[in-house]
């Protein structure tokens, strides 16, 4: 089962990705997590990515495509995977298609911009694992602490309101065209496309996903 998640930053993709991973036993491949791991390791790619991400800009296609192709070739992706944050652009989608990767489901999470700004300013992240919480919608068991390790949670620089607005502008310009792209792919019989109302409660979205992916 090979799945792509579409939707603006903060649309709830990460939370639902956890649900899908646990339910179907496939890994989530988040370019954000891959880049954050590279940043933490202090690699050259990590340094380049950090400078761009701190400004709310996107990492260039060629860096991202190489990273993703290496990742989906690994053994844990044999039964499928979940792509979150990739592809972001039509050239990336074409590169994925050209590499012979067939996508079974494309899931779009639809949420208005103003809801996203409110959501993201309340987001807290466990840096080492990428686990994400929200002070209102999905709080940790202990305030400011990761449920699994008990380590401190942080507010990422790219979750600050002014950066969120910049990221949304970039999303609408670069990534929104993928909605049309994958709807066309679905009409051609190459994948299945579903749009979900991301303003619903987390459990309601999960139930809807369960029915779709079954």
Curated annotation (Swiss-Prot):
Q: Which GO terms describe its molecular function?
A: adenylate kinase activity; ATP binding; nucleoside diphosphate kinase activity
UniProt cross-references to Pfam families, sorted A to Z: ADK, ADK_lid
The annotated pathway is: Purine metabolism; AMP biosynthesis via salvage pathway; AMP from ADP: step 1/1
Name the predominant localization: cytoplasm
Gene Ontology CC entries for this record: cytoplasm; cytosol
Where do the segments described as NMP lie? 30-59
The cross-references to InterPro entries, in alphabetical order and at most eight, read: Adenyl_kin_sub, Adenylat/UMP-CMP_kin, Adenylat_kinase_CS, Adenylate_kinase_lid-dom, P-loop_NTPase
The compartments listed are: Cytoplasm
Q: Which family does it belong to?
A: Belongs to the adenylate kinase family.
> Which NCBIfam families does the entry link to?
adk, PRK00279.1-1, PRK00279.1-2, PRK00279.1-3, PRK14527.1
Give the function comment from the record. Catalyzes the reversible transfer of the terminal phosphate group between ATP and AMP. Plays an important role in cellular energy homeostasis and in adenine nucleotide metabolism. It may be linked to the biosynthesis of lipopolysaccharide surface molecules, which are important for the pathogenesis of H.influenzae.
Q: Can you say what this protein is called?
A: Adenylate kinase
Q: What is the lineage of its organism?
A: Bacteria, Pseudomonadati, Pseudomonadota, Gammaproteobacteria, Pasteurellales
Q: What gene does this protein come from?
A: adk
């Amino acid at each position: 089962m090979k799945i792509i998640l579409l939707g603006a930053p903060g649309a709830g993709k990460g939370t639902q990705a956890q649900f899908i991973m646990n339910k179907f036993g496939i890994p989530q491949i988040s370019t954000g997590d891959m880049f954050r791991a590279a940043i933490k390791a202090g690699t050259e790619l990590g340094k380049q990515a950090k400078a761009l991400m701190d400004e709310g800009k996107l990492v260039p296609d060629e860096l991202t495509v190489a990273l993703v192709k290496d990742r989906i070739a690994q053994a844990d992706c044999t039964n499928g995977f979940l792509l979150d944050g990739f592809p972001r652009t039509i050239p990336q989608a074409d590169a994925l298609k050209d590499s012979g990767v067939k996508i079974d489901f494309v899931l779009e999470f639809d949420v208005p911009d103003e809801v996203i700004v409110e959501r993201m300013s309340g987001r807290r992240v466990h840096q080492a694992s990428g686990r994400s919480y929200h002070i209102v919608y999905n709080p940790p068991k202990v305030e400011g602490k990761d449920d699994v390790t008990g380590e401190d949670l942080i507010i990422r620089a790219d979750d600050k309101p002014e950066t969120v607005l910049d990221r949304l502008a970039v999303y609408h310009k670069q990534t929104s065209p993928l909605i049309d792209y994958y709807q066309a792919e679905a009409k051609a019989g190459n994948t299945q496309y579903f749009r979900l109302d991301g303003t619903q409660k987390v459990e309601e979205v999960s139930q809807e996903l369960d029915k779709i992916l079954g």
